[in-house]
Amino acid sequence: MTLIPSSTPPLPDAIGRKMPLLKFLLPLVGGIVLAWTCKDMINRWEWLIAALIFTLTAITAIVGKRKWNGWTSAIAMTLALICIAGAWSMQRYNEIVTHWPQNEQVWLGQVEQIKKIKESHTTVIAEIKSDKKQYNQKRIQVSLQGNETLKLQSGTNIAFKARINEKNRPGNPGDFDYATYLLQHGLSGSAYCHTAQWQILTIPTTSNWHTRFLHLRQKLVNQYAQYFHDTDLSLLAALTLGDKSLLTTETQQLFSDTGTSHVLALSGLHIGILISLFNLLLLKRLRYGWKHGAATLFLLAALWGFVLLAGAPLSLLRAALMFSFMQVAQSLQRIHSLSLNNLALAALLLLIIDPFTLFDVGFQLSFTAVFFIISSNDYLWQRHRLPFWKDDIYHFNTPRREFYTPKAYFRYFTLPSWKYRIKKHSYKIFRSVLIPFICISLSAQWGTAPLILHYFHTLAPYAWLANFMVIPAAYILLSAALLFLLLPFSFTQVALAKVIEWTLHLLTQGLQAISEWPFATERVYATSFTLVCIWFVPILLFFFFEKRKTLTRKALLISSVALLIISIGAETFSTLTIRRITPRICVYKATHTSLIHFIQSNAISYLLSSTTADSTRLRMTPIEQNFFMPNHIASPTLITQSQASYPTLQRANGLFLFHHKRIVYLNLPFELNAIGPIDLLIVAKGSPTNATQWLANTSVRQVVLDGSLTSRQRKVWTKACRATHIPCHDVLQQGAFIWTLP
């Protein structure tokens, strides 16, 4: 055996040369971000006027003959592109933003897509049908209750009575900004309807191609439902058809904890599997000519049909565009069919169609992963490959059998030859399949790690290892599901259903086992600077080892060390100052429940709840994830006794003393004349009904209405506070009340 080392080729061209469309993509991205940041200050016409001024400046510089006119024209044209992108973004923003009536009204709508199916309600995307121009064809998200939701499908007309909210009500600290999420996804508002507040209409429906494909997807899911149930059905529908409405929170959490959520979102992985099957079965058997061209056109038509069938998610649109460019390039016998420039072109097209696509997490993860996969392959993996295998001359000379006994021939020639061939093919598989698989997985994980930590605060160290299980399973499931749908015979579907069921069970059990490993899932809350360092420090170190000039190597090494030192300093400063919790009182937003939190420090705090310990733990789960964990707040001590004394908190029935402040928890009608001035009055269910008289006889600085009050009690106390000129905070309307103590 001889291994022939391959010489290391020089560094490829810079990113700017490999990606010439980057000069258009970056101004477009910058304009969208600036427009969103300044959406309340700069309107569309101001962006257009600025774009016109910069365009005229660029033209003037091009016509002129001075030395610096080239730079002037380039800068002016870049600024003009930024302003044009800003104007287009504001145009899109104005189309989405809608000021809905403040009262409940009856609306007509058509279901576009079923977003999520839960036991309590079903969430759909609906298009409003109205005679008023400002409301017609606006897309909103509606949550519907009742058994009738089982009859909903794409294209169904519904009538519902609700108040549509364009802005979400403030919630608890660290809560998800739901209104911004809806706006960035082209949705003008949200509504919630109880069972008696909506109904399905039997009027004829007019559906577009998108709705028809979604209706077809629902039929295919129903076909799955004849053989699969519960978790198997939800996973199969998500992995093969992009329908994630049936996925449970537990299943999504399992894939998130193991770092394999990408397999649930249809993307380049799934399209790559389908195209590889098509190439293997058909395209590779056809020479370049009209037959190959016809097969390519059929492949592209099937590809885009699959995109529409899956609901056209952004990750799938990106993959479909890139694979379309790749197939066309291969038909034209172009060598570099999969390039960074194709990635930039796909991003440009999607951002021109809808600029707010930029803020979609799936869009960011998809493009970042592909960018790092291609870049790492060009700069690192293709330049430092394992050596080739070269056969020894001995193995080309096989002696004649008649000179040896069968036993001797088998021992000295046949058996060594088998061992040699096994070793040779194993090495080729290791070099051509296993190593590229690991490299792609590590590149994607490195590129998407900062975004995942920023949005989800989750680190899955074994994600690259879990891909060895997930990706082969996805290949089997897609292939079997394709045959399952194309061969509608009972005996074939039963056999394929068994294969799919076994694969799904092995997949879920394997991921469950990985999720139980030590350090399988870590919650990380890092500063933005540290997240950026995850990208740039490895890049600087890579060029440090590649460059040969001493000064360049010193500059790269110093830059890497400086970034690491600044990152450590930023994390230390954030932990000691920004995330250090000072004494405060928090009255959280929770319906039908009182949740009052007395915080002394990050390590010491006390919680008063009006419900049981199990119910309190359930209601506090999102607050712990969004507020406690990012700020390193320990679990609070639950106050269970009416008479209690702690180092910084004393309780006597409804009276609390915390940091020399008097706090009254009013859930019983009793007199407080002997207590004196009240710094904070928390009104709960069971409080006295004569609110005005009660407030007039006491000295109260601040009133807080917690979530346990009924709407009638809330109105009574709000009116009483206005009459007595006492500040009043309603947690259900204004969000959690936070009082930072001196």
Predicted segments — roles?
Residues T2-I15, K67-W71, A80-H262, I633-Y646, ...:
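Membrane-interface helix/helix-cap signal primarily in integral membrane proteins
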Residues W45-T55, S366, N467-P472, S528-V532:
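Alpha-helical transmembrane segments of polytopic membrane proteins
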